[in-house]
Each structure stands twice: as structure tokens, then as C-alpha cells.
Amino acid sequence: CGRKGCFEAYASATGLIRMAKEAMAQHPESLLHATAAEGGEVNGRTIFQAKEQGDPTAAAVVDRYIHYLAVGIANIINCFYPEVVALSGGIANQGEALLAPLREAVAPQVYGNQYLQTHTRILGCTLGYHAGIIGAAMLPTAL
């Protein structure tokens, strides 16, 4: 929806791209401009590529994105104690470049119980963009 305070506004691909575009406007020297110019559009992959190439602007954008995502995931863990939090979509395809710092950022925000900090696994879906659709299709067979 794009409203302020909504998890999706900050911790989605749309949120990451919005943050990157805001940073690009303030930092014309950023590699984000070059990666966007090659394909014509900035996206999750190009933002992570610029970070991997050592661009401090892209690194700041990714770190901010991971912070927002970690806050939301920690709140989910604190409320529901899931065994697994599975991330899907294009940004989840970044693998451990996303997941390792995300796990590190989530851990201190999970309530003090050491069990909860290690019990919930944060994983990327192997089904890519179709994970939600496949899960929804399988739901009736599980009921």
C-alpha cells in the first residue's frame, strides 16, 4: 500500500527499490547509477551487485533494508514462535548475501530466550517466485 509504518512498505522489493532511488538522488557517484543504466532499471539484484562491488551507498541501502526486514521478522518470531521463516521472491534469490546478515540482525531482537534465538530458522525458498502460489495450491491437500 505504501503507507508509512507498514511492513511491506519497508521490507519488500518495492521498499528496497524506493530506498535505492532515494539514495541515488543524494549520491550521483554511486555505482547504483551504472548498474541501473546497464539494464535501464534498478532492482534487488542490481542493488546487491553494487554492494558486492564495494559501493558504500548500495551497502547503506541494503543494511537499512535488512534492518527493517529484521525488525519485522523478529516481531513475528516473538509473537508466533515459528520453526521456520521462509522468504521468497527475487530478493530471497540473493541467498546468503541476504540471509546471513539478516539472521545476525534478527537474533538480538528476539526476546531473551536463547531457545527462541536458535529455534527459528530463516531460509530462502527454493521455489523462487512461485513459492506462494505453490503453497496456496497445496493448502487444500493439507487440510
For each feature predicted by the language model, list its residue ranges.
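ATP-binding/phosphotransfer module of carbohydrate and carboxylate kinases, centering on a glycine-rich
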Residues: 3-143
